[in-house]
Amino acid sequence: IYDLYNELMEYDGGGDIVSVMRERLAARGDSALSGIRSSDISEIFLFFDYDFHNSQLSVGEINRRVEDMLALFADETENGKLYINYPMIESIRYTKYLPDRDYVRYAVSREQCRDFKRLARDFSAYGSLDHILFKDGETPTKEKYIRVKDNWEYLKRMNVCKANLLVNGVDAMPAEKSDISQQAIFERQVLLYVKPDDSVAILNSFPVFIYEYMK
């Protein structure tokens, strides 16, 4: 996504994100966006891992890049809206049995993030993602459908409440979705976790996205 950001900035932030993405895919032999124009797409959402364990970059440089991307990717109807996973997408697995009332307290150090995929797998009460996903071609039973739906509702509430606690100091669902903007979440992560403790509060952006999109 940062490469995409750099390409758009070559046009002073005024580039066409759909055209840039189409060209990038075509260069790899992927025709998924062939024939698709900007006018065909009304909303764009981007998901990014807060890769602060990257040993090639300082934390300061990582944070500067995230700030730049959040500024550019701030509107789903324009350049797209960016959502950030802390520390990475595998945070969706970092729970005990749902609902996990201790989730609000979970954080991870920068050093632990180097092996976070294994850490999340070992920590999880679930041996796979079957509790939140259907397999390709699966016809779920009514019981599984309800279970998966309920688990996403738990994940949504857990992550949104945690984001609200992080930003506003209130462990409850926010009154407005703007109360937990991605910019505000990032700023509070840096202030409360990254700078003082070299850590991040575990937070997954997919449940937050679902909350915002459905609200």
Give the location of each predicted region.
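C-terminal accessory helical subdomains adjacent to catalytic cores in phosphodiester-
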Residues: 2-8, 28-215
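RecA-like P-loop NTPase motor core
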Residues: 1-27
